[in-house]
Amino acid sequence: MLAVLSPAKRLAARPALDLPADLAPSEPRLQDQADALARVARDLTAADLRRLMHISEPLARLNVARFAEFHEARNAAVPAVALFDGDTYAGLEARTMDADALRWAQERICILSGLYGLLRPLDRIQPHRLEMGTRLATERGVTLYDFWGDRIAEALNTRAAETGARVLVNCASVEYFTAADRAALKLPVITPTFLEERNGERKIVSFWAKRARGAMARFIAENRLNDPADLRAFRAGGYAYEPDLSTDERPVFLRAG
């Protein structure tokens, strides 16, 4: 079983992660493609970044500086799960994983990225902001989806072949999972859905759903899951499997609001 997560927009101010002696940070397998994108992004102005990603002027200026220094600042790279600091990563809580779970996660948890394509948790990455939905023109087209094409799906196929995984658990957002070309992907996909019931209405509450996606990835890693049926035992955040709302491809987990 593989699981995929979205990255986080919010980055840790002081990223830190204690690793066991036999587990070292790794390098992104699609670093060459990240370098190519960084060269394109380096030519963008703060106004360009504000328009493309709808971000503030200070954040746009910060990322102009990051892309300008991208190829000279590789020593600033840190493991992805230490750098990402959003709600999903609060649910994942990689800093509190034991060594065995972290080793398993390094092999089986994948992080989708607009800049790096596909990451392992301990892949060293640099601070950046480049959302997958960005309409950044490259030699491959006018969006990052065009740039990545089937490369992310093929990278997932490679991970599956290396690990023997036979199913992919999609804990990513629609924006990011769209980058995994389903026609090229050789794995069946299971997409857990996290709903909150309040006043008789069931709906996705973004904050809790993002945390639950990270917690689901942690649950998979801690329990070394391979059988999709075992996902039903997930209980973090007050969620519980709801069989009447679920299908094999879309297990639904419900919590009271």
Swiss-Prot record:
GO CC terms of this entry: cytosol
Family matches, as InterPro entries: YaaA (IPR005583)
Signal peptide: none
Lineage top rank: taxon: Bacteria
UniProt-listed GO biological process terms: response to hydroperoxide
Pfam families named among the record's database cross-references: H2O2_YaaD
PANTHER family in alphabetical order: PEROXIDE STRESS RESISTANCE PROTEIN YAAA (PTHR30283:SF4), PEROXIDE STRESS RESPONSE PROTEIN YAAA (PTHR30283)
NCBIfam families named among the record's database cross-references: PRK02101.1-3
Family assignment from sequence similarity: Belongs to the UPF0246 family.
Protein name from the UniProt record: UPF0246 protein RSKD131_2757
Protein species of origin: Cereibacter sphaeroides (strain KD131 / KCTC 12085) (Rhodobacter sphaeroides)
